[in-house]
Structures are given as C-alpha cells and as structure tokens.
C-alpha cells in the first residue's frame, strides 16, 4: 500500500492493495498501515508444479529463479525466470496469448490458489480469499457502502486478469484500455 501511496503523490486516500492483503489510510496527513496480511507458502509445492509446467510447455530455460516468493505470501511464476532481461519480457507475450493458452491448466494444477496472468511473462498466485472483488466488498461493508454505490476502475478484466473478479462478481466498472490518454 505504501508503494501505491507514493506513486499517487501521497494523495490522502484509503488504499486496498495486493488483492486485499494490504490496507492503509491517511490520518492527520500521515500514512497509516491498517492491515498487512501475510500467508505461509508451500514452496516445494510451487517449485514442483512450476517445473511440471516448464517441462510440458518448453519453458525449461530461464534466467534467475523459477519462482519468486514474496514476503506477504504472494507467489510469482515467471516463465522467463525472475531475472529475465526487460527487452525479452516485453516481446515474450504482449497479447498474453501464450499464458492464456495454458491458464486453465495452471489453475487446475494450483487448486486452492487464485491465479492471475500477471506482468509480461508471469502467473501470480494468492490464497483464494485474496482477490479484488472480495477486497473491495470487505472494505465497502466495513465503511457502510453497498455494491450499488461502487464504481471500480481498472484495466485487466479478462479471464485471469487482476480485475477479473470485479467483472465476475457483477460490480459496475470502467475498463481503461489506454492509460496514456
């Protein structure tokens, strides 16, 4: 949440981040962390299943580590590895077609986790209870808002996208397709 707060020029706003794992507010002009959930991760499970995907689909050569384990308990499985060159990442899967082709298989293999097509080369994983729809609705209920009073703005509503649970949950949203304008 602190990263987002700083990216927004320290604008005094409540922030729900990392699919609901983090929450912050601003009190008297100061950033205040409200919640910062952490989950235990079965690293062996992720490494084993990532290797199965690599071998089956030909992603056995990669730079750095196969899987990145974040402090909060989120996991990133980058098909090009954790240390892939930026230029390789940018041309690897710009339309996400390579990852969409194996998305259902990855979801099946990693049951018990929410799977997102993340970044430019990766799949991101959170525990099932962490997704943007549930995070926004939890925040809304605690602050006296109904779903009908919420308008979500995002850019990744397709299946596997970080905002997909918003669409699937039936929340009103605006889909940003070109954030440069």
How would you name each of these model-derived features?
Residues 142-147, 160-181:
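Asp-based, Mg2+/Mn2+-dependent phosphohydrolase catalytic module
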Residues 15, 152-153:
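Residue-level marker for buried hydrophobic side chains located in beta-strands
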Residues 16-19, 119, 177:
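Residues at the C-termini of beta-strands that transition into short coil/loop
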Residues 1-64:
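Active-site phosphate-binding/coordination module
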Residues 21-26, 122-125, 180-181:
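A short acidic, often aromatic-flanked loop/helix-cap motif at beta-alpha or helix-coil junctions
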Residues 56, 60-151, 162:
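Conserved acidic, metal-coordinating active-site core of Asp-based
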Residues 20, 81-84, 157:
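Short, glycine/serine-rich, charged loops/turns that create anion-binding
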